[in-house]
């Protein structure tokens, strides 16, 4: 069960960092192909 907890913590941390960067820097350029 420890692996599941660590995976959840890792995903949540990455999600928080991603949202923080995404919302701090609003996309000015209209996304043509964001991949």
Curated annotation (Swiss-Prot):
It is a single-pass membrane protein. GO terms for cellular component: chloroplast thylakoid membrane; photosystem II reaction center. GO terms for biological process: photosynthesis. The chain crosses the membrane at residues 3-23. The keyword Transferase does not apply. The keyword Thylakoid applies. Keywords: Chloroplast, Membrane, Photosynthesis, Photosystem II, Plastid, Thylakoid, Transmembrane, Transmembrane helix. It is found in: Plastid, Chloroplast thylakoid membrane. Pfam families: PsbT (PF01405). It comes from the Eukaryota. PSII is composed of 1 copy each of membrane proteins PsbA, PsbB, PsbC, PsbD, PsbE, PsbF, PsbH, PsbI, PsbJ, PsbK, PsbL, PsbM, PsbT, PsbY, PsbZ, Psb30/Ycf12, at least 3 peripheral proteins of the oxygen-evolving complex and a large number of cofactors. It forms dimeric complexes. HAMAP family: PSII_PsbT. Found at the monomer-monomer interface of the photosystem II (PS II) dimer, plays a role in assembly and dimerization of PSII. PSII is a light-driven water plastoquinone oxidoreductase, using light energy to abstract electrons from H(2)O, generating a proton gradient subsequently used for ATP formation. Belongs to the PsbT family. This is Photosystem II reaction center protein T. The gene is psbT.
């Amino acid at each position: 069960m420890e692996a599941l907890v660590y995976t959840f913590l890792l995903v949540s941390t990455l999600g928080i960092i991603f949202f923080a960067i995404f919302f701090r820097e609003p996309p000015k350029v209209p996304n043509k192909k964001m991949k």
